[in-house]
Amino acid sequence: MKINNFLTIILIFLFYLSSPAKDANTITIIPKPNEMKIGKGNFVLNPSTKIIYSQGLDKHAAFLRDYIKFSHNFNLLITDKITETNKNFIYLNVKDLNSNSEEYELDIQPSKIMISSESPKGVFYGIQTLRQLIHSSKKIQCLKIVDKPRFVYRGMHLDVSRHFMPKEFVKKYIDFLAMYKMNTFHWHLVDDQGWRLEIKKYPKLTEVGAWRVDRGDKTWREREPQKPGEVPTYGGFYTQEEVKDIVKYAADRYITIIPEIEMPGHCLAALTAYPEYSCTGGPFTVPPGTYWPPLEAFCAGNDKTFEFLEDILTETMELFPSKYIHIGGDEVVKTRWKECPKCQERMKKENLKDENELQSYFVKRIEKFLVSKGRKLIGWDEILEGGLAPEATVMSWRGTIGGIEAAKSGHDVIMTPTSYCYFDYYQGNLELEPIAIGGYLPLTKVYQFEPIPEELSNEEAKHILGAQGNVWAEFIPTTTHAEYMVFPRIAAMAEVVWTNKNLKDLKDFMSRLAHHTKLLDDLKINYAKSMYDVKITSILDTIKKQVKVEMSTEALNPDIRYTLDGTEPTKKSPKYKEPFILKKSAKIHAINFYDKNKKSKESSTEIVLHKGIASIVTNINYDKKRYIAKGLYNIVDGVRGSLNQNDGKWQGVQGNDFFATIDLGEVKNIKKVSIGFLQNYHFSIFLPRDLEVLTSLDGKEFKSVGKVQNTIPIDEKKIFVKDLSCDINDKARFIQIKASNIGVNPDTHPDKGFKSWLMFDEIIIE
């Protein structure tokens, strides 16, 4: 018996001896700390654990207590008394670390956890790190973290003009930012579609400008303007007392709120309330959707306009103590200024050569006022037009060019380019996602964002303050939808702005995120599951004229099941293991069965193997900047496009006709030629007027063998793909396609007169 007990002890000892020690890769903190060393042992949280805090950190202790109560239902004692008899405690402490105010140290030992910083802010960030460690387990790995952010500006934006978001959600949104150690909330309070901030000197801004007619039964771009006799009922606004409450709530979490008061454009809600500050005098109504171009702007030739705006900014600054005030400055269509006698007189008086310089005058005048009040101006990168205001900070959204220009001229910059930072873009396959404004920005692409452009020198790079994610709400009508568009992309953005570039690793991030979703689930956050969806791609072998199929997910370790006949996959369907050669045309469907009983949405694509696969394409015209897809072989790779023009399967030409010539390599019997076209009315994408097919034996002399007219009405607003086909029954080596563009958008279109797109995916030769 004693021998058996001895053997048991030896086996247990050997088990622990052979158990692998945890390393940094098993710690699932987001954003990833910049310095971390794993220790030995664990701190075990229990109901008797005390939270001890130094002077001034009582709120921090309360935050931590609440986080722990949420995770483990322990209501821990908090105290500012520390004694030598204390065991199993968490100590929050402000002390001299010879570091910056955002740096913190987190030291986890078997008997205690210590969070230290030079400032309460740093302690708060340490608490956010500990919060994530505690949520996953009561047993917390011993470690030491010394951490600080890479960038001083770490932000998220929220548009509450297009759809009003209640105060409770705004606070919840601030909590989201705090969880990821972000420090700036860019609050887009006003725009054409609604004024959301109470200004006591001008009550009609909220009495009139905060409300519009309800067109919730229509998509954003289909909404008709307010008709005579209709009563605006949709909207809302924040009282000044509510704003003060929100500002304090954010400050308690070390988040600065930067308000945005749009000018000189995007101001139709304000002009509806006070039309005398426009160029035409109105009348106006608050639009329930977006109509392009947005013609109205504040009159730059009227001094009363500036008095009006300065009064508004004065009340705004009384509510928001932020260093910065955002004045917009984007997308100002200057038609009204060109037609306005007062604006033209202003240009003459100030010796301004054009309306761009008039915009510069406008921004500089507002900046001078803000500087006189001890504030700094931020504007979208259009404020560069006509000359930048002396102390302005540029928010670069139209790519990085504006940010580069501003930084090279010595101005501070916040990077937020559409291609990496616009969270209103689709994050997955359009056919699987709720309707969005357009674009395509998956989680992994957000993570790959580098805010400092390579074009900048080390000295110029110092002007890049940081970056932010933008949440424009045209297609985000509810708070749960807002959460869906924000999460989990906010986690990727948080790591972009916090973690040093050399420590970032996409695979490591996705591994940590897989664990992090438990916290999101427990917080009941409606995060997108798009990272689990299967992406089906193809590789064209132009030598063997074969198509190889690949399947992948953004999430790690997928269990992908697929079918080739268009039926829904089950757990018993073939498991995807490696790329495979497609033997015949297929309607491929795939589902990722992940995390035990969960499954992704069903992905699908169609690949058609035809006589033109991998043929040589010559003399083709397509936009080689916006819609490159797979280049010359895109129309002969067998892959059909989805309903999303940005899925990488579509090519297009704007304003001009489409033509292409295909060399089959040898003379073949051709029965039929088809080509797929996309119609998306709201994105100015239309079917062609007609399709003509020509054939040739030698590539020199072509004959027309078929022509078909499009019969679908030009104003059809559904998004769909239409194949136009010609039965030809001919022998040919060369096939030539001609499709005529409608040229410009019809008069019924919101963007009438603009050059229209003709988009095509595959030429199918049978």
Language model features with spans:
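Bacterial Sec-dependent N-terminal signal peptides
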Residues: M1-T26
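Feature activates predominantly on carbohydrate-active enzymes
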Residues: S99-Y324, R365, F369, Q468-W472
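Flexible, acidic glycine-rich loops studded with aromatic residues
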Residues: L377-E382, G387-A392, R398-K548
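Aromatic, loop-rich ligand-recognition surfaces of beta-strand-rich domains
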Residues: L643-G706, K718-E766
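Short, compositionally stereotyped local motifs that mark structural "simplifiers"
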Residues: I52, N500, K504-T661, L678, ...
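Active-site neighborhood of glycoside hydrolase catalytic domains
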Residues: A270, P287-G289, P294-P390, W397-E405
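Contiguous, structured surface segment used for ligand recognition
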Residues: K22-Y153, H481, V497-L523
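Surface-exposed loop/turn motifs at beta-strand-loop junctions within extracellular Ig-like
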Residues: S119, N592-K596, N741-G743
